[in-house]
């Protein structure tokens, strides 16, 4: 009887360890997903920054392409913020999961601002592009200030 209890106990322990490992892998994948999206978005956003600051010559088609890429990428990271992914190799604060409505509002605002940036880029008007860029950057910074570890 005692042997059966040990075997059953070991089986339960092994299955819970397997479930825990699967959850850890899911969490790791979520973190990798959002980090990759933010990294690529940052690359294109930096190119736009160089243009609006005059460190890179204005090239209308490239600005349009970069702005559209940022717009597309702005929709990708959010599915990587799954419960449990506040642990691990991440700069995300736990507040994201306690203030989900605020986080969702800022993520939606970023998507809106990047969409506007892409539209304004098509005008070719550098002054308007710079303003739209600054509004987008301010939205990024607001979210980082509240929800990103330093």
Predicted feature descriptions by range:
Residues 1-8:
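Bacterial N-terminal signal peptides that target proteins for export
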Residues 9-10, 20:
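Cleavable N-terminal signal peptides
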Residues 16-17:
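N-terminal signal peptide c-region/cleavage motif recognized by signal peptidases
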Residues 28-60, 64-150:
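Sequence context surrounding c-type heme c attachment/ligation sites in exported
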Residues 13:
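Active-site-proximal loop/hinge segments that shape catalytic or ion-binding/gating pockets
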